[in-house]
Structure formats: structure tokens, C-alpha cells
Amino acid sequence: MFPNSILGRPPFTPTHQQHNNFFALSPTLYSHQQLIDAQFNFQNVDLSRAVSLQPLTYGTVSPIQTSTSPLFRGRKRISDEKAFPLDGKRQRFHSPHQEPTIINQLVPLSGDRRYSMPPLFHTHYIPDIVRCVPPLREIPLLEPREITLPEAKDKLSQQILELFETCQQQASDLKKKELCRAQLQREIQLLFPQSRLFLVGSSLNGFGARSSDGDLCLVVKEEPCFFQVNQKTEARHILTLVHKHFCTRLSGYIERPQLIRAKVPIVKFRDKVSCVEFDLNVNNTVGIRNTFLLRTYAYLENRVRPLVLVIKKWASHHDINDASRGTLSSYSLVLMVLHYLQTLPEPILPSLQKIYPESFSTSVQLHLVHHAPCNVPPYLSKNESSLGDLLLGFLKYYATEFDWNTQMISVREAKAIPRPDDMEWRNKYICVEEPFDGTNTARAVHEKQKFDMIKDQFLKSWQRLKNKRDLNSVLPLRAATLKR
């Protein structure tokens, strides 16, 4: 996919191939979630040297050999999945120590729907002194928890379930994103050798659809030696280098790379092979933490994922699900759904951060945050409401019950709480608390016109759905299914 993803990795010295108890860590989930503690100075990055394709040497080790594969002789990559399986795409180097294929099966296949936690490959690593991705070894899979999708008790609930089963992200979709992430990480490590690239957001949190974009977080320095990156200066400088690298070295594989200078700057681009749109940020590590918090909520109760997906589809259809245009982000919408399910007379969800503070503490190191979903048992709610009733209740709650002027949505507290009087919250139309850093995830809604449009859509959709009890009345199913 990318020219430097074919670079090999030199064999490790015998001492580094042996297990070392000093560096032994708990099993980790991804090849890119590994403890890094070497120092670097991004201000002094030499881009001209970093992007060089000359063979690299590591001490007395032989230089890396580049592939002679015809796929990379200046021609566009062949995208026939059958002719070149995914597993094979990840091993294009001449090394006797090939890196085992790591497959993220975080989204269940159709045969895995009874599981709340799909099978996960866990890995651990042996640190290495050279600047390359350490070798990985598989360890036994975790046993998933059994869970069934809810029964459809009425027409509206059946429509919600059918839309969910059609549009939910598949394992094949996730594999494409993970393949791109792994190869991009190798490219970016030419600029920042100690960096790691994390796939975050809806791709991993259980709420993704087949059409979901990929969100990437570039961590230039991981914990415990993690430092804060100033998003206005350092992050923009780092992303400028990444953007330049994409434009100059990867133009044949990435299209439309664009540097967005927002509060949290990002590089937007599209992978030509998988046709997936990506957003890449720097050291916005709260996104890694909330990915696994949301994933735990997603699989805690079997009505959560179908309800969230249909609400995201509904909001997108009515043009109120686009933070770049002054409406609600998908993340804010998910938090709004979780908050509603927490505030019912018989709650469907609890506050995980209150019940399991040690699992969702910000003191948990990044390479361990993926353990949280595995440590939380299913939540047994006495609430037996159907999916249709819950969708109606969600629309009614925000149309007629929630006080937008004085209240803030808090999943952390599992209730609506008074707005803070800080500048960040003052004069804001919608306040949704980020569970980890306490910021306002709905700060993009800064125009009264957009706020009124959002409230109006909640009210109209609730009234229409209450009268007709047909999902088509608020979300045309044919159009929603075609978008997937």
C-alpha cells in the first residue's frame, strides 16, 4: 500500500530474542500499543533524511532489504483481495523473522453476534534497541461473554434491528482500517521513530457502521514518560511534517491530504486502496481512553448498539450530525444516548467510572486501557423496554424533558448536572461533558440557528414517530441502507 511498508526488519540479537522478565508486560491488544520510553526532539526532525528510501543500518546488523515485488515498481497497487489476501499484504520483507499477522477482530462477524466481546488477539513484546517495530507473539485468546441481540417485540423494533444488522461495521471493514494503520505507522516512524499510531473512535468502540471513517491518534511519546503536546504549536508542527510526507512520498496511495487547523488539528486523507476516509490527530490520548470506555458501554447491554446506530443514522439524515458544520459530532450523540439510558426510572446503563474507577482511571497507562472491557461483567437491568420504545423515549427526552439552558449531560455522573460557570461552558447552547477530561464535546454548536434546528428536529421526529410507529417516518430505510 505504501512504499516503505515493504521495508524489512533486521534479525534481533540473541539477547533480545530471549524473554526478559524486567520488560515483561501484561498482554496487549495491538502491535502499536507498546511501551515506548526513548526520548526524541520533534523540533529537530530532518524531513529530508527521514523520508529517504536508502537502506537503513542498525549497528552491526545487515541493512534492510527492499522488496523486489512487482507490486511496488512504481505502479499502482493491485487491489484484488482474492489475488492477494490480507495476511500476505502485511509481510513484504526479506527477513527470516517475519512478523506474525495481527488481526483485530473487535467487531463480531455475523456468527459472533451472541458474544458481547468478540475474540481478540492479545500480544506482548520484547523491547529492542533498534528503531523498528518490535516482534510480536500471539498468546491465548480471551473467552468472549455470551450475549444475544434483543428480540423485536413490534414493527418499529424490528426495523431498528434490521437496519443495525445491515449497516453495522463488519470484521472485513475493520481489517482494512487496521492494515492501513499498520502501514501508515511504518511510514510515520521514518519521521518519528518512537511514535505509535492508534486506531480509535467508532472503528473500535462498537458503534461503527460500514460507512464509518477511520480515526487515528499519533502518539509521539507514550506513557509513563508521556508529555503533553501543545495542540496549537507542537501538534501543528508535527502534522505539518506528516502532511508534507503524505503529499510528497505517498501521493500514489493517499489522496486529498488536508491539514485542518482546528482546536485539535488533524490531517484528513483518503486511502485509495480501501477507499476509507481518515482523520489523524497528535497525542489526543483522551480519544484512546474514551474508545474503550464506549466499547464497554456498547457491549454491556444488548440494546445499546442497535439504538446508537439508528440514532446516528437519523441525525445524519436530518443534517444534525456534523461538528464541522456547527451541529453534533457522532461522539456527542453517543454520549447523549448513553446519558438517556442512564437516567431512565429503571436505568439500562450505570456509570462505569463510578462502579469501576480503577479500570477507567486516567492513571491507567495507554498500553493497558484495552483491558477495561474484559473486566466488566454484563449489566442486568430490570428495564424491559423495546428498542422502539427506547427510540421514542430518547427523542421525547431531549425534545421535552432535558433543560438545555441549565443542565449538562454527564455520562460520568450518570445524570444531568448543573452547568459549570467556567468560560468554556458559559453561553454554550449544548453542554456534553467529556468523561475523562471534562471538556465540552458539543462546543461546535455555537450558533443559535443550528441549536434551534437540532431541538426542532428532536421535537418533530418524536411527534411523527409517536403517531406512526414506523421508522420510515423519520428515517427512510432504503436511503439509510444504501449509505450503510
From Swiss-Prot:
Motif Nuclear localization signal positions after renumbering to this chain: 76-92
Catalytic activity as recorded in UniProt: RNA(n) + ATP = RNA(n)-3'-adenine ribonucleotide + diphosphate
Gene3D superfamilies recorded: 1.10.1410.10, Beta Polymerase, domain 2 (3.30.460.10)
Keyword Metal-binding among record annotations: yes
Source species, domain of life: Eukaryota
UniProt-annotated binding residues for Mg(2+): 213, 215
Modification Phosphoserine, positions: 62, 69, 95
Domain (PAP-associated) ranges: 386-440
Cofactors (names): Mg(2+); Mn(2+)
Major localization class: cytoplasm
InterPro entries named in the record: MTPAP-like_central, NT_sf, PAP_assoc
Pfam families tied to this protein: MTPAP-like_central, PAP_assoc
UniProt-recorded Gene Ontology molecular function terms: ATP binding; metal ion binding; poly(A) RNA polymerase activity
Assembly description: Interacts with CPEB1, CPEB2, CPSF1 and PABPC1. Interacts with QKI isoform QKI7; promoting recruitment to miRNA miR-122 and miR-122 stabilization.
Protein family: Belongs to the DNA polymerase type-B-like family. GLD2 subfamily.
Name of the protein this chain belongs to: Poly(A) RNA polymerase GLD2
Species of provenance: Mus musculus
